[in-house]
């Protein structure tokens, strides 16, 4: 396993730990999720390029589309919660139920 894969794996683990530690604020959770998606995207892209998997070349693009959708939904939820309650605490998400 090369140093690049080790660094990307550590970046994923650090983002996961950040998600577990800073789960009270929505903005911190979204940033940690984006870090996880970015490290997964780079890891999948490097694996496909180094092993010459031509059939799986669409996997990073699909992952990027899901990451963009997740970011858009997360930011819209963040704006809605911060405009409604003035803070970005995750506990305010329980109050959004109809």
From Swiss-Prot:
One of its GO terms (cellular component) is mitochondrial inner membrane. One of its GO terms (biological process) is ATP synthesis coupled electron transport. Keywords: Electron transport, Membrane, Mitochondrion, Mitochondrion inner membrane, NAD, Respiratory chain, Translocase, Transmembrane, Transmembrane helix, Transport, Ubiquinone. Signal peptide: none annotated. GO terms for molecular function: NADH dehydrogenase (ubiquinone) activity. It is a multi-pass membrane protein. It is found in: Mitochondrion inner membrane. The chain crosses the membrane at residues 1-21, 29-49, 61-81. Its EC number is 7.1.1.2. It catalyses: a ubiquinone + NADH + 5 H(+)(in) = a ubiquinol + NAD(+) + 4 H(+)(out). The keyword Mitochondrion applies. Core subunit of the mitochondrial membrane respiratory chain NADH dehydrogenase (Complex I) which catalyzes electron transfer from NADH through the respiratory chain, using ubiquinone as an electron acceptor. Part of the enzyme membrane arm which is embedded in the lipid bilayer and involved in proton translocation. Belongs to the complex I subunit 4L family. Core subunit of respiratory chain NADH dehydrogenase (Complex I) which is composed of 45 different subunits. This is NADH-ubiquinone oxidoreductase chain 4L. It comes from Mephitis mephitis.
